[in-house]
Amino acid sequence: PNPEAAETLALAIKLADKKNADLILATDPDCDRLGIGVRQKGKIKLLTGNEVGILLTDYLLSEKKRLGKLPSKPFIIKTIVTTDLIYEIAKDYNAKVYDVLTGFKFIGEKLGVIEKQNELDNFILAFEESYGYMAGAYVRDKDGVVAAMLVAEMAQHYLCQQKTLIDRLEEIYECYGYNANLLKSIEFKGMQGIKEMNEKIEAIRNNSPAALGKYEIKQFKDYQKGIEGLPSSNVFADHASVPALANDSSLVSPRTR
C-alpha cells in the first residue's frame, strides 16, 4: 500500500470516523514512508509530504529553541523537488538548508560528508516531498517509525493549545507566505514507456518553453549538467514568474505489467 494514495487510507479514515480519532498515521509495508490524516472541522483531511515536512521543520526548530536545545549551526536537508518554503522557516533560526538530488541515498551521502566535518550534532531533519522523513542520524534513510512518533507528539502539542496540525499549517503560511503543491504522476509502461519518457524529457530540454500557461519562464535549470555542485541527474526545473515547477524523471517511474 502506498501512503501517498488516498484510497490506501480509506479503511483508516472509516475507522477514524467511527472512533472520532484526531489523527491517522499510515506507513507502507517496510515502514519507511508515512502518510497522515488530520481531523479538521469534523472530517479527515490528508496532508501532503511537503505539508508534513513544513510542519516538522517548524515544530523541531521552534521547540528545540524553546527548550534551549537548538544547536549552534542547525541544518535541514531536502531534495531539489521539495518545497522551498523551508528556506524561509530556516532563516528565523539561522539554520542552513542543503538541497540534494531526489532520493534518500543522496541525503544519506550528504550526512556522511557532514559527519566527517564533525557537524552531525547540528542535524535537525531531512525529508522529501514523497512522504519520506528522517530526524536524527540513527538511520541514514527515511524512517516511518521516528516520523510517526514525531507527528503524534507534534499533533498532541498543538491539540493542547486547541489547535490542529492544519491550524498550525495555516499560521505558518500566514507568517512565511502561502504555498500550493501539486504533484502530477504520469505512468509510462515497459521499455517502450522508458523510451517515450526519455524522448519527451529531451524534447523539453532541447527546446524549453518560454512560458507555462500564462506564466513566463524566468529560469531553466538542467541538473544533467551537474549544476549547483550536485551530481549529474536527468532532472530539469522551470522557474516561472509566479510558481516554481520541477520535472523529475525519477518521479515518473515506468512500470512493467
What annotation goes with each model-predicted range?
Residues 48-61:
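Catalytic or ion-translocation cores adjacent to nucleophile or general acid/base/metal-coordination motifs
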Residues 32-51, 86:
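Short Gly/Thr/Asp-enriched flexible loops that form oxyanion-binding sites at enzyme active sites
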Residues 17, 21-23, 43, 63-257:
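Phosphate-binding and adjacent anionic-ligand microenvironments
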Residues 7-11, 56, 106:
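Well-ordered alpha-helical segments embedded in enzymatic catalytic cores
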Residues 33, 53-55, 104-108:
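Short gly/pro/ser/thr-enriched loop/turn and capping motifs at secondary-structure boundaries
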Residues 28-30, 37, 130:
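Anionic group-transfer/hydrolysis microenvironments
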Residues 1-33:
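N-terminal small/polar loop signature for handling phosphorylated ligands or for N-terminal nucleophile
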